[in-house]
Amino acid sequence: MTTPKQTMRRPRLASIAFASACLAPLAAWAQDAQQAGGSFVDNFERIDPSRWYVSDGWNNGPHQNCTWSKKQVSIKDGALQLQFAQEKLGQRNYACAEIQTTKRYGYGTYEARYRTATGPGLNSAFFTYIGPTDKKPHDEIDFEVLGKNVGQVQVNQYISAKGGNEKLAPVTGGADQGFNDYAFIWEKDRLRYFVNGELVQDVTDPSKIPSNAQKIFFSLWGTDTLSGWMGKFAYGGAPATMQIKRVAFTAPGEKCLFPESITCKIN
């Protein structure tokens, strides 16, 4: 772990040894104390360094077959481009891409419009996360498209490192064939996931809803080891690309930061 901004994310089939129980009392004030980020819309005309940190020079563990590289992050054709490419970097033979917000965000509406990569062993992810590297419990809310089957997206959430809330939702036409809209509305007692404006998961059990403010991430990465989940990795011969047109966070009490926002239609 070479930087305090390192994600320290987990493989789905392994657990992080972490004593979260002693931090549980902090959850009640975590939203107010650490929600530094306010509402925003980013159409990625550029990568704003005050908003985004580009992961560079490390990997998240043995499950990941690539090294995060800032060279794989760019703006092109009106979108943020995250690439996975064959390039010897550190102890890995591939380079991959991730960005994360510099601030944390709490309850509210999170929206992104993007096109995923394709290929077995690849993961195109839009998610929020906080964890031990930030001296907090591991809380997380996920949209993940696995390149082995781009006709569906997996939604999931972690509360103090406990997951097991996975659900697969269809992405009509394929997540890699065009831009699709992914959103979640995160409230204290409810968490709703949407794909292209359609509700695909509604969580109302408070024990299955994260409480800690989190950073927003986009990432494209691969694996040689999690083949049961992500498929057997096979490099396609050319770089794979995830393209993000827009991301937005709308704080509670606000709405319609952009015309297509789900907050214009959902109470």
What are these regions (language model features)?
Residues 26-30:
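Sec/Tat signal peptide C-region and signal peptidase I cleavage site
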Residues 16-25:
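Bacterial N-terminal signal peptides
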Residues 3-17:
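Bacterial N-terminal signal peptides that target proteins for export
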